[in-house]
Amino acid sequence: MRRLERTVPEIAADSAFGIACGASGLPVENLAELFLPEYFSAIELPAGLLETASAPELMAKVLDCFDDVQVGSIASPPEEEPPAPLLREFAERTGELLTGLSEAGIHTASLEFSGKTFADALLRALRPLAPALNRTGMTLLLPFALPCADPETPARFIQLLRRSMIPQLKLRLDLHLAALPPDASPRDLAGTLLQEVRSVFLRWNADSGEFPGKEQIAPWLAALERNGFRGSWLAAPQSADPLRIRTEAFRFTELLNELKQPSAQQKGFSL
């Protein structure tokens, strides 16, 4: 007997939504303004928080408020072929950060790198992190933005993950919603990359008047559900005024309420 697919409202009601505070540029001193557990169950923190005197207190509060916590952009691998001493320094520094986060009770973090980073250079930087990832049980996310100019890029990224042979290395999918082709399905755009996603950033330019609609997010909810996704969906609005994120956060809660209404969809998407 064929298993019935869950509807989008059912998926949305069971998903972890929140705000990507680090990716949105929210100053560390304003983080507490977005500790809104009555609306959200997930959050992304800026790596700069780790360097502040208030870090232990804030992180304890975050872990008390949210079920799904990650720290963004903890390190940037070298863009080109790095010398051995630089690789060792990167591995040691990043390994220490991973250990510290794990001891604090946070088990997910992301790296940051540009599109200019060569795959082989990235692999050489990532492989020395395997012992720290194994020891701590941390999940390390690599950002991948959609849409991308080359349709073969998702397949190449999958190959990079496989070549790394690091099971804790997964994907953070950055969806630039206004740029997504309206007639292309998630499968068309991402292919089997969807199987490796552990977190989704929903990106839009608030200063340009952009704001996502439920018709943009619903297909991705359904597609990732089919791939067993149980990660977080984080709003990451961009603005010249980083404090605008609070306004966007409350608008996002209204969108989530729409997605969770039975009228949002009466049957599963066929993607």
Which stretches of residues belong to each language-model region?
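Active-site beta-loop-alpha junctions enriched in small/polar residues
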Residues: 20-24, 46-50, 74-79, 114-116, ...
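Alpha-helix-loop-beta-strand connector modules within alpha/beta enzyme cores
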Residues: 58-77, 125-137, 162-166
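Histidine-acidic metal/acid-base catalytic patches
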Residues: 1-21, 25-41, 91, 95-100, ...
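Glycine-rich anion/phosphate-binding loops
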Residues: 54-58, 83-98, 120-123
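Active-site groove signature of glycoside hydrolases
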Residues: 102-118, 136-146
